[in-house]
């Protein structure tokens, strides 16, 4: 049985979602897991719940089970590392994009924009950061503004025209990689729309 298949079956059997498998030099086998996402329904969104995250105990449970499974299958590795996806989580399928709709993401295209850029962005550009949205065509798009960030204490002229919003539509087949943008706000976590204040 292939490594991907062994790990997927083991992780799914324990009730988790496999995010990524990475083999590194020195025999390191790194497995990234997350909780299975259930799309919100009226009943679920009506219930006031706390967002849940992967804990150390979850990683320990998966590690113990994977050690047995990998030994039985004869997979060669020196060290096994099981972790949560972190703030720059990989987005790999349609369900991940639905789950993180409205979040800021970083995408890398397989091919540069080329003539499709239409002079709006550099034709050789492949990396973009923006807010993930569902496109009118049914695919996905990211929306961003090239407005420079405002520095603390900086005054903004009332005459200054804001930079226009730009959008880039894409399909999952056109992506080399998509990840949540690692944005950390040290001022505290604000409430999301619909959450109790």
Swiss-Prot record:
It is found in: Cytoplasm. GO terms for biological process: ribosomal small subunit assembly; translation. One of its GO terms (cellular component) is cytosol. Its main location: cytoplasm. Pfam families: RimP_N (PF02576). NCBIfam families: PRK00092.2-1 (NF000929), PRK14642.1 (NF011235). This is Ribosome maturation factor RimP.
């Amino acid at each position: 049985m292939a490594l991907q298949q062994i790990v997927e079956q083991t992780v799914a059997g324990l009730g988790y979602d496999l995010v990524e498998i990475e083999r590194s030099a020195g025999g390191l086998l790194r497995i990234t897991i997350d909780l299975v996402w259930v799309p919100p329904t009226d009943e679920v969104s009506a219930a006031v719940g706390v967002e849940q995250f992967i804990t150390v105990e979850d990683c320990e449970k998966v590690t113990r089970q994977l050690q047995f499974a990998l030994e039985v299958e004869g997979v060669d590795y020196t060290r096994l590392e099981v972790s949560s996806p972190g703030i720059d989580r990989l987005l790999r399928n349609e369900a991940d994009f639905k789950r993180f709709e409205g979040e800021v993401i970083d995408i890398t295209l397989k091919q540069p924009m080329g003539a499709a850029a239409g002079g709006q962005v550099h034709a050789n550009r492949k990396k973009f950061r923006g807010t993930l949205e569902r496109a009118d065509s049914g695919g996905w798009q990211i929306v961003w503004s090239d407005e420079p960030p405002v520095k603390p204490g900086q005054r903004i002229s009332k005459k200054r025209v804001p930079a226009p919003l730009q959008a880039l539509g894409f399909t999952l087949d056109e992506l080399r990689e998509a990840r949540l943008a690692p944005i950390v706000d040290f001022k505290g976590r604000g409430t999301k729309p619909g959450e109790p204040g």
